[in-house]
A protein has these predicted regions:
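Bacterial N-terminal signal peptides
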Residues: 4-14
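Noncatalytic, solvent-exposed loop/strand surfaces
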Residues: 18-150
């Protein structure tokens, strides 16, 4: 759980200072897929208190990177045992959890190494839609305004 929270907080620290052309971080490694941003003034260091706008505990285990569209930060998530697969939407400004949507119940999850997670792939987001895959367990599209699974 600490790792998932750290990803969210570190991603949001950088996300809070994105330049106008980098306002959205729609995929793994950003808009161009190269991990670069044109933003300036980003923090070079942070700790539990330094350069952190907010912290939000998120249960579960996930290695996926967060994606950002407007004021929404979306995270793929899974229970430790892989029986529940979900996405979480956090408000970029306040850190409040806006949605915690269970997408799949998995009766018999496939093997997952203890150093991995059932929520490893980073989602992809565009205006109004979030796409997330959990491998053999399923792929989903979520309406980001309503939370409906499409």
């Amino acid at each position: 759980m600490k790792f998932a929270c750290f990803l969210a907080v570190s991603g949001l620290s950088a996300g809070a200072a994105l330049a106008a052309d980098d306002l959205n971080w729609p995929q793994f490694r950003g808009p161009r897929g190269d991990g670069h941003t044109t933003s300036t003034g980003l923090p070079l260091r942070w700790s539990e208190t330094e350069n952190v706008k907010w912290q939000t505990p998120i249960s579960g285990k996930a290695w996926a990177s967060p994606v950002i569209w407007g004021r929404q930060v979306w995270l793929a998530n899974a229970t430790e045992d892989g029986t529940e697969l979900s996405v979480v939407c956090v408000n970029r400004e306040t850190g409040a959890i806006e949605r915690d949507l269970k997408l799949f119940d998995v009766e018999s999850p496939q093997f997952c190494h203890k150093f991995n997670s059932y929520a490893s792939p980073t989602p992809v987001i565009e205006e109004g839609r979030l796409y997330v895959t959990f491998g053999a367990a399923g792929t989903a599209c979520v309406d980001t305004a309503t939370g409906a699974k499409l």
